[in-house]
Structure formats: structure tokens, C-alpha cells
């Protein structure tokens, strides 16, 4: 599992990203009949083990960072590649994301608790940014405050929309602009 979403799912919240907008992370999980493995480059291994998956029974399998094409050779030592698939087609394996996605649809109780806590933290971030907003602030300033309040709570905003006054009813997804707040504010965080 190489996508950020599947890696987070299989590791109960592990974060394999470097770039927020990348589909795949810098680590992948391989699960076989023989065991579970963390596939990553030599330069990413320390952070992933220390901060993301060290509590899990994943055996680290590393490849040189400058040879990402060498992963299939590493995989061949662990599994029969003719019977191995990937969520994203990583490492030249057949992609079966549609088959992986339903596995994430039903949440276990620890996942429900994490999502409830995330929702509460996100609400606090939005509320703090809105309370700090003042007439004359630009939508961009307010969006930056939402992002900063989110970051303080270990939340990475994927969507940070802000509209002031007449822009609220005009646009369904108002990207923040230099428009200044006069009276009314809309903020959306995902």
C-alpha cells in the first residue's frame, strides 16, 4: 500500500507524506502471508520508524534513495510478484485501488475516536481563527490564520476556503482573495 490514504489506514494513522499533494508517500506497507513490511528508502526510514510506525510489527525493508527502480528486486525477495498487487500501481505492480478502497469504509472504534478528536480539533482551529478575525482583515489573512491554528493542532488543511460579505453567496467554493472583511465571514476547513 503506497498511497498516503492506504498507508495511513493500514498503520492506524501513520503519515508517509513529504509533499502534501503527492498521491504516494515515501513509505509503503507490504502485507504477505509471511509478514508485514515497511518499504522505504534509506533516507526516509529513520523518521518513519521513529515517528510513524515504530510501534507496529512492520519489518523495515530499505532500498537506496537514489535507486527507487531497485524496489522490484527487493520485493522479489519477499513475495511472488506474479501474485502481488498495489493500491496505486507502485513499483510496477498491477493497480487495484478500487478493491482497496472499500476496506477503509467501515471504521473501527479507535478510528471513530480519532476522527471525533480530529473534528473537535478542526472546530477549535476554525473558531480560534474566526474569533481573531477583525474588520479590515483580508480573506487571505484569515485563511492563513485557519492554516496556522490547524497546524498548531497537527492538522494539515486540504481545503481552506474563506469568503467575506458579498462573496459568501456568490461562490460555492470561495478561494480566499484580498477582499477585506466588513461584517460577515464564511470559513470552510477540510
Q: Where are the predicted features?
A:
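Short catalytic-site patches enriched in acidic/histidine residues
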Residues: 7, 11-20, 96-100, 137-190
